[in-house]
């Protein structure tokens, strides 16, 4: 990939950029962000919607995303009290930026499974000395 000088972060920001890109590289964070695309959701709704995530991991991810300014946490003072999570403006732009990646993943899942199976079959076949 060709880059121009404007594509590169300033020298001191390179490490900080990597830290921010950890959000994009984390599967749980992207899946949580995706679930918030249509508006605020409660913890239990997110837990049901994000297949395979544990309660602890979801709690950690929500706190991390809130800390990074990707989402907001709102406590509703009703009976019974509950909490909802929603994307911030910045979170919305993250959702827009990563939506094509998630769509690509879904579109190519079967081909990736086939490639892995073919690779694993070759790896299990002994080679001649």
Question: Where do the model's predicted regions map?
Answer:
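C-terminal regulatory/oligomerization modules of transcriptional regulators
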Residues: 1-12, 67, 72, 86-129
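N-terminal helix-turn-helix DNA-binding core of bacterial DNA-binding proteins
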Residues: 10-57, 63, 77-78, 84, ...
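Residue-level detector of alpha-helical recognition elements and their boundaries
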Residues: 35, 47, 61, 73, ...
């Amino acid at each position: 990939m060709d880059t121009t000088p404007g594509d590169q972060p300033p020298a001191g920001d390179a490490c900080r950029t990597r830290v921010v890109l950890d959000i994009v590289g984390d599967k749980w964070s992207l899946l949580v962000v995706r679930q918030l695309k249509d508006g605020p959701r409660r913890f239990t709704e997110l837990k049901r919607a994000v297949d395979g995530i544990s309660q602890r991991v979801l709690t950690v991810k929500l706190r991390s995303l809130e800390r990074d300014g990707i989402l907001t946490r709102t406590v509703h003072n009703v009976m019974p009290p509950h909490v909802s999570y929603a994307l911030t403006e910045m979170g919305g732009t993250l959702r827009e930026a990563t939506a094509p990646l998630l769509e690509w993943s879904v579109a190519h899942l079967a081909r990736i499974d086939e490639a892995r199976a073919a690779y694993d079959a070759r790896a299990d076949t002994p080679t001649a000395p």
